[in-house]
C-alpha cells in the first residue's frame, strides 16, 4: 500500500512533464517556421511579413531590421517584449490587423522609428504613453480604428518631429481643445470626420502651420468652426465629400487677420447655383487665397448665379482656377456665364478639364486680360466652334494653351484660329485626329513648343513652324523626319516607324531627342557624333541588330552611357539569334562574326601561300612531271592492252638526241638493219605517223617494239622529247615488270646525270650492265655483238 501511494505522485509528475514537453515541442517548430517564413529580409534589412495570417508579432526580431511590414494579418495585441530588440527600426507597418490593445511600453525601444502605421485596426482609445518614446517619429497613421475621441489631452505631445498625421474613423465624433498640443508644424494633416459632431473652437489653433490640410466633414456647423481655425494655419486646405448648404453664415466670420490659406481644393463636393454665389462672396474675404480647385464635383444648377451680389463684393485675389471632371446635371440647360466678365480679369491660370466644355463665348474670352495659362484638355471643342472660343483679341496675354484630347479635325483651321494668340509660346493639341496635314499653316509668331503627339499624322510637312524649340510628334504614323528646324532643341519621336535617326544638319541645335519604340535597328558613330549639341538620346525599346560595327561603336564611344536614356537595361538585341534578348552593352561577338572579310582575306592569303609553296616544292621535286606522267599513263591504260607478240613491229625503238642522229642513223642503223638476220628499228624521224600527236607516236612505238634503246649522252639528258621517251619507258618497266630498256652510253656520263625521278632506270644503271660505245675500233666489233645479243634476248 505504501509503495502504491508513493508511485501515484510520481506518475502524475511524469505526465505533467510529458504534456509540457509536447506543448514546447509543438510550439518550437512553429517559431522556427515563423522565423524562416517571415524574417527573410533583403539587403536593406527590410522584412515583409504581410498577408501571412500571423496572430502575433513573430519572435526573432533583431537590431539589424530597419523596415518591418506586418500588415494584413490577425495580430490582436502588441506586447512589451515583441519589439524590444528591434532598436534600429525606421518603419513599422501594422495596418489592417485586429489590434485592440497595446502595452504601455511596447514602443520603448523604437527611438529611431520614423513611420508608424496603425490604421484600420480596433483601437478604442489612444494613449500618450504609447508614443512617448517615439521622439524621431515623422509619420503617424491611426485612421480607421474605433476610438471616438483623442482623449482629454493630446496623445501627440511628445512627437516633436511629426510631419504627417492621419486620423479619424466613422465613430470619431469629438475634437477637444488641447488634443493637438505639442504639435507646432505639420506638412500634412488629414482628418476623416464624416460623423464629427462636436468641435471645440480653437482646438487646431495650437498648430501654427499646416502645409496641406485634408478634412472630410459633413456637418456644416462643425465644418465652419474647423475652417475658421484653419484659416490662420493651413496653407493648402482640401475639403472632401461635402455638400454645402450655407445661406447667411459666413465661413470667415469672427476670423482675425492674418489669414494664411493660399489654396482651397474641393474634392467630391456638391454645389447648387445658390451656394455657388455665396461661396464666391465668402472666398473673396480670404485675401491670401490664390488658388481654387474643384475635383470630381457636382453642380446641381444651370449657372444662374447672383452676379449682382458677386460684383458688389470685394475683388477676388484668386489667380489660379482648376476644375477637373465637373459634372453639371443640367448640362444642356447651362447658361453662358453672362455677367461673370468682371470677375476674371486677375486670373493667371485657368484649367477646365474633362468637363464637357465645347465653347467659350468670345465676349467672355476677351476679359481674361491677365491669363497666361489655359487648359481645356479632354473636352468637346470642335473646329467650327474654335473661332468663337479663340476670337480676335481673346485671351490677350496667353502664353500656354492646352487643347489636347478634344474633337479637332483640321490642323490648318485650328492653327489659323490659334494665330490670334499673338503672345502664345506653348501649344498642346495632342490626341486630336488631324490625319493628313497641309504644306502651309498660319501660327503665332513666337510659338516655341508644339505637341502634336497621337494625332494620326502620317507625314510631317512645312506646316510645322520653323520657330519651334520643342516638338513632340510621338505616337503617330511617321516613316521619316525631314523638317528643317534650325532652333529646335528637343524632339520627341516615340512610337513611330522611323528606321534611322533624323539628319543632324536639319536640326543642328538639338540637345535632347527621344526615338524610343520605333523601328530603329542601329545607328552609326557618324550619325551619333553629327549631333554636336546632343546631351540626351532615348533610343530604348527598339529592335537592335547587334552587328559588329554597331557593337564596336557602342563599346568604344566615350560617354555614350551618360547620353543614352535607359542605358543599359532598355537596349536589347533582336538579332542575330544567338544574342536575341541580351543587353546591347553586354554582347561580344566572335572574331569570325565581326571580321569576316578580314578573315576571308587572311584565309585566301594563306591558301595562296600554301599553293605557292606547293608549286615551289613541286618544281623542286618534279611534281609537275609526276602529274603529267600520271595523266599520260592513265590515258595509255585506257587503250587496248599491249598487242600480242604477233603485233610487235620492231625489234627496238631507238630514243636519241637530235645531236646524236649522225651516229644513230649512219652507224647503228647500218650495223643492225644490215645484219643477218636484220633487226627492225623504229626511228622517230622515219617511222612516226605524220599528223599524230607526238606523245601517242611515242607510246605506240614503244609498245610495238620488243626493246627500247636509249642512246645516252649529255645531249640526251637535255632533250625534252628524250625525257618523254624515258618517262614512258619508265612506266612500261612498272607495267610489265621486265627489262625492256637497253642503255647505250655514247659518251661517258655519270649515272647521277639521269634525273633522280627515273628511279628504275637509275637502278638499272647501278645494278645491271649497260653498253658503252668504245672509241677504239678494235673493240667496236665486240660492242655490236653484245648489242645484237641484247636485242635477241
UniProtKB/Swiss-Prot annotation:
Q: Which UniProt keywords apply?
A: Disulfide bond, Glycoprotein, Immunity, Inflammatory response, Innate immunity, Leucine-rich repeat, Membrane, NAD, Receptor, Repeat, Signal, Transmembrane, Transmembrane helix
Q: Which residue intervals correspond to the LRR repeats?
A: 64-85, 88-109, 112-133, 136-157, 161-182, 185-206, 370-391, 397-418, 423-444, 446-467, 468-486, 487-508, 509-530
| Compartment(s) of residence | Membrane
Record field: transmembrane? 598-618
Q: Which residues are glycosylated?
A: 48, 120, 161, 195, 254, 325, 402, 451
User: Superkingdom, according to UniProt?
Assistant: Eukaryota
A Pfam family (short name) is: TIR
| LRRCT domain segment(s) | 542-596
GO BP annotation list? inflammatory response; innate immune response; toll-like receptor signaling pathway
Q: How does it sit in the membrane?
A: Single-pass type I membrane protein
Q: Provide one Gene Ontology cellular component.
A: plasma membrane
Tissue pattern of expression reads: Highly expressed in ovary. Detected at lower levels in heart, lung, gizzard and testis.
Q: What does this protein do?
A: Participates in the innate immune response to microbial agents. Acts via MYD88 and TRAF6, leading to NF-kappa-B activation, cytokine secretion and the inflammatory response. Does not respond to LPS and responds with less ability than TLR2-2 to mycoplasmal macrophage-activating lipopeptide-2kD (MALP-2).
Report the protein name in the record. Answer: Toll-like receptor 2 type-1
Q: Which gene encodes it?
A: TLR2-1
